[in-house]
Amino acid sequence: MTTYQTLFLIPLAISTLVTAWLPETDKTITSRNGTNLFASSKGKIRGVNMGSQFVFEPWIAEKAWSSMGCKGQKSEFDCVVSLGQDAANKAFAQHWGSWITQDDITEIQSYTLNTIRVPIGYWMKEDLVNKTSEHFPQGGFAYLEKLCGWASDAGLYIILDLHGAPGAQTPHNPFTGQYASTAGFYNDYQFGRALEFLEWITTKVHQSDSFRNVGMLEIVNEPLQNAQKVGSMRSTYYPDAFKRIRAAEQKLNVSKSGYLHIQMMDKLWGSGDPEEYLTDKYYVAYDDHRYLKWDPKVNVSKENYISTSCSDELDSNTPTIVGEWSLSVPDDVASTPDWDMDTNKDFYKKWFAAQITAYEKQRGWVFWTWKTQLGGYRWSYKDAVAAGVVPEDIDSALNMGVCN
């Protein structure tokens, strides 16, 4: 397939390889009913994360976590140990089949969104898991394929994100799939396992029609924010990931215009310059996560939050997608009258508009996350729309002129 080719989403022969791209740059896509979700955004990414679908973060959905029998467990690893493998497999299968459904994808499409980012863990390639020392749910890949099929039919662009890396890329955080005491990812053994995963998922993406709208693969989410400690990641893992992904694509005779975009956290993230050791930057992309609530340099006031967001220039590397952000504020003020969600909707509307205005100076944005069980909208796009804070027509937020 050639650059700028138009792809209509029709059934493909099983032997046909599926290609990757950036929407409206490399090709145009439409849903099965003929809708081009990128037409209104002029090619900008506007998306939501599928948080807790395949890498469960208990804080997002404590009720669902408890119903699985995982109450009190810190991570997927811990829950599988507690339940036992067979019981855990059944519990997680029920979760995978109910947390994000085809109805969710239809609703996402209806809100003028055009992209989903799907966090996944290396344990989805089950033969990578050391059965004596590592414990993760089994059977997730079939549900990933089903989800991506729904999204492709809807005309949504898909980013797959290695959220949980072997050994854990950061300690004490369930988004790695395990509540590890130390970050064990940064060595040749764990890099090797991650590379095997990247080869495998790349091959799966190009071989299945369900993955036809997967155009980007993030090779590790949120590594340590310490450039010195992760030097080997930049010098070894990043270049090797490019080589292994491209080799897998070449083995399948994928044309260069059909390659996956390979995504890394940008320089602003704090893990050093991702380009430092790269010799091949073809179809490279970058990710930035912007949470003002955790930025100690930002004074906490509503006026400052809006002005800071309006002035954000997240262009340390290009093209950059702001792959995580929210409407959440520091915990010590979140419940105070000045920041109350019910009485300050006008502020949250403006702050949403300010953030997307800034992020669309770059390639676009993906909100964290689509849905939660937190009882509010600051972390939940679905609930923010229901509350009237986020409009169904995203352009109407941009047209508010908050940053003018």
From Swiss-Prot:
Role this protein plays: Beta-glucanases participate in the metabolism of beta-glucan, the main structural component of the cell wall. Acts on lutean, pustulan and 1,6-oligo-beta-D-glucosides.
- A cellular component term (GO) from this record? extracellular region
Signal sequence coordinates: 1-20
Instruction: Kindly give the SUPFAM superfamilies that the UniProt entry links to this protein.
Output: (Trans)glycosidases (SSF51445)
Q: Which reaction does it catalyse?
A: Random hydrolysis of (1->6)-linkages in (1->6)-beta-D-glucans
User: Mind listing the GO molecular function terms for this protein?
Assistant: glucan endo-1,6-beta-glucosidase activity; glucan exo-1,3-beta-glucosidase activity
Keywords assigned: Carbohydrate metabolism, Cell wall biogenesis/degradation, Glycoprotein, Glycosidase, Hydrolase, Polysaccharide degradation, Secreted, Signal
Answer yes or no on keyword S-adenosyl-L-methionine: no
Q: Give all cystine bridges in this chain.
A: none
EC code: 3.2.1.75
Question: What PANTHER family does the entry give?
Answer: GLUCAN ENDO-1,6-BETA-GLUCOSIDASE B
Organism the protein comes from? Aspergillus terreus (strain NIH 2624 / FGSC A1156)
Q: Under what name is this protein listed? A: Probable glucan endo-1,6-beta-glucosidase B
Cell location: Secreted
Pfam families, A to Z: Cellulase (PF00150)
**Matching InterPro entries:** Glyco_hydro_5, Glycoside_hydrolase_SF, Glycosyl_hydrolase_5
UniProt similarity note: Belongs to the glycosyl hydrolase 5 (cellulase A) family.
The reply on keyword Signal is yes
